[in-house]
Amino acid sequence: MYIPNLRNYHDKVFPYGPSSNGYNPVIRLTDRTTQPDPSQHIYQEEKISKCEGLSYRAREWLLLSSNSNARVAIALAEPVLYLPGATSSEIQSEHSAVLRGSLCIQIYKPVKLKKIQLSFKGKSRTEWPEGIPPKLFDTYEENSIMNHCWVFFHSEQKVDENSHGAVWYKVLPHYADTAHYPRSMECFYPGEYVYNFELPISCTYPESIQTDMGRVYYFLETLVDRSSTFSGKSTGRIPIELIRSPCSTSVATSEPILVSKSWEDRLHYEVQVGEKCVVMGQVVPVNFKFTLLGEVKFHKLRLFLMERRYYYCRQRSVRRKEKTRQLLLYERSAPKNQCLLSDWKQVRPDVYELSDQVRIPGCHDMAANIVHFDTTYPNIKITHTVRTVLRFSCENSPELMGSAKYLEIYIDSPVRLLSCRCSDGSTMLPAYCPIIPSSEVNFCSIDNRIIAGMNRDLALDSDIIGNSPPSFDSWTAVPYQAPPPKYDDIFQSGSSHDENHDDN
């Protein structure tokens, strides 16, 4: 293939022909034989049942483990944690996220416990089906990212015999009599025992990643160990999602992608696409403007989302690059032997404009392993580029060689693809609305804007919400009082007080 010398790094001009090789297959999201189910999201894989009947109020209790003696439930203050910043400089300037919640142990009958423990762990795993060089024995590599442990109760530690170290507890009235039921360090009587936990998570930790050849995952794991030798341990696990969000102080992320170039003094083109940071499932505007300076005839306009995936292991000494994925987002073609610009808006002579909208693939495409958001983890690197392809014909062009009849201009612009949870409704401060359970938060934020609007309307309805603030008309008039003192009077009195104090 003939590639001429390029004048700049943005655009690449080369002849197009039906027999051109070296192109990756194009993924047409609208022409697939099987479409992914929009109701299936990457964040709904693990279902955790709710825990009802607990006295201690929390956002939502989720059941982790249960047996004939007790059950363990957990409530998270925030079901999703956001780590702002993408580059090292942005991460250092941001504050840490905080993982906090409550752990409840509900006892059904008197039991002796040895230890109550909660662990927060983060792990990464990359798959290598062909084997890791040089020996090719290992087919995967797993690393530990973090491991933090809270020991709420231990039989060897001295704690209160009634609460057993819990911040809140409630014993059934039948077992409240200490004369008939003497207290001991290990014995837990039927009731509820709540333990709070809190952990700051630095923004330097990687976000949660889920691909076919690698993943990064975090989870909370509980351990309730009984004192008896033959009574097993009760364990439970709940996943925690860490989402990478844009930096709050960065202005460059909201700037649009704008490319303005000229080619051979025959064509001047301007392409503007959305923003440099786009959210999965978001609809972004696209604007095209072409100025014909010579005899140029347009035939096709296409917009691609290019995804590149790299996997590393053995301290980044081994690398594997997957085939670049081309997702066709937008396409406009002209009929045979006609010009594409004939249907466009003509601003001035030989100046044409087109404005349209493009939908970015959503999280249901991510669940189908079609696309994934950008990552910052060194061992799993995923980057994206918006590629604009302009196909046209031009007479007497030096780039046309052989049987090629058309020319194509490739315009590559880097873009950062964010998770669908990074919509404005998730990253901005919440409205005054009822508490939304964690099961509803697991849905994609963009697909549930209608639900969010319903909750917002419900919050503003004073007939439904009894805690709504009163209207301005319901306030009674305040009786007249003396006006506040002047600033000079306060300053003089303060100065005289200081002088008297100095004299003393």
UniProtKB/Swiss-Prot annotation:
Highest taxon of the lineage: Eukaryota
SMART domains noted in UniProt: Arrestin_C
Example GO molecular function: calcium ion binding
Cross-referenced InterPro entries: Arrestin-like_C, Arrestin-like_N, Arrestin_C-like, Arrestin_domain-protein, Ig_E-set
Region feature Disordered, mapped onto this chain: 481-504
A GO CC annotation given for this chain: cytoplasm
Gene3D superfamilies linked to this entry: 2.60.40.640
Pfam families per UniProt: Arrestin_C (PF02752), Arrestin_N (PF00339)
Biological process (GO), any one: ubiquitin-dependent endocytosis
Family under the similarity heading: Belongs to the ALY1 family.
Role description: May regulate endocytosis in response to extracellular stimuli.
Protein name per its UniProtKB record: Putative arrestin-related trafficking adapter SPBC839.02
Species per Swiss-Prot/TrEMBL record: Schizosaccharomyces pombe (strain 972 / ATCC 24843) (Fission yeast)
